[in-house]
């Protein structure tokens, strides 16, 4: 037993629906209902929320999405989904850093202006960046 009665387990994890490509550093990514179902097997109460971005964050996300699409279109053999995680980690790191640097250089004002206050927590939905769940053990 890890939690006392009425103890809370708080977890955040990426929302697979908003992931732009396979991240080899993530062992598993979840859909909202999938994670909720897993938690409900062990916890009496599960509060499902999501982390959302405002218009500025979504503008950055869409620019990043286009940039990632330019990179992944070169993966004609779909190796990102066929190779084991460990083989993708260093290429992912290199390409991710190059992509983030390019995005910053091309969008300095936007990138520099994004703050924590541009994010909010609300009821879970398909367009949340991260799943944020609070599970309570009775």
Question: PLM features: residue spans?
Answer:
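S-adenosyl-L-methionine-dependent methyltransferase catalytic module, highlighting the catalytic core
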Residues: 1-136
